[in-house]
């Protein structure tokens, strides 16, 4: 029994360390020509338009080449599909920025929004000229629960 407890503790520590290092590797700094305050302010302005149902205004904010592949309805569907069941909007719990060089260099304003039933993560990507080039939204699920942990650990030990 003592050996099983030690093995479980070691496995847990290894999973926690792997999770932390994976999260650190995923983030890049904003491009040199962009600053956090500007990216967050632009992101919050568009976030407010989305939450107010001003989808046509948000559509108009996208860079022309991106807008060519979108419709007002696609923007509306994306947001409403993620917020419809989330309840009433209560506010921003967390806001931060990251950079990315995937596709092209850009900055991302990330918002974790509190709703009465669920939290929703909304990310807005801007090119260095501060034109909107991307939007994503998704219900924020907890990355950890006791039942998930015990299920994962029981799989390690054949149980």
Segment roles from a protein language model:
Residues 15-19:
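C-terminal motif of bacterial Sec signal peptides marking the signal peptidase cleavage site
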Residues 55-56, 131:
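Primarily extracytoplasmic ectodomains and periplasmic/lumenal surface modules that are beta-strand-rich
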Residues 56-106:
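Short solvent-exposed beta->alpha transition segments
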Residues 96-159:
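Exposed beta-sheet edge and beta->alpha loop/turn motif
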Residues 1-8:
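Bacterial N-terminal signal peptides that target proteins for export
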Residues 21-52:
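Short, low-complexity N-terminal intrinsically disordered segments enriched in polar/charged residues
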Residues 11-12:
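Repetitive helical segments and hydrophobic/amphipathic motifs
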């Amino acid at each position: 029994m003592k050996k099983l407890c030690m093995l479980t503790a070691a496995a847990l520590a290894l999973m926690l360390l792997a999770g932390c290092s994976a999260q650190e590797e995923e983030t890049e700094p904003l491009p040199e020509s962009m600053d956090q305050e500007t990216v967050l302010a632009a992101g919050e302005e568009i976030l407010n338009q989305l939450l107010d149902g001003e989808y046509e205004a948000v559509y108009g904010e996208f860079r022309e080449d991106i807008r060519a592949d979108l419709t007002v309805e696609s923007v509306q569907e994306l947001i409403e599909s993620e917020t419809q069941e989330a309840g009433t909007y209560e506010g921003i719990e967390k806001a931060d920025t990251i950079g990315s060089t995937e596709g092209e260099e850009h900055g991302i304003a990330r918002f974790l929004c509190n709703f009465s039933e669920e939290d929703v993560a909304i990310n807005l990507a801007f090119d260095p000229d501060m034109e909107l080039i991307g939007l994503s939204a998704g219900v924020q699920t907890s990355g950890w629960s006791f039942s998930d942990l015990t299920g994962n650990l029981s799989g390690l030990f054949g149980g």
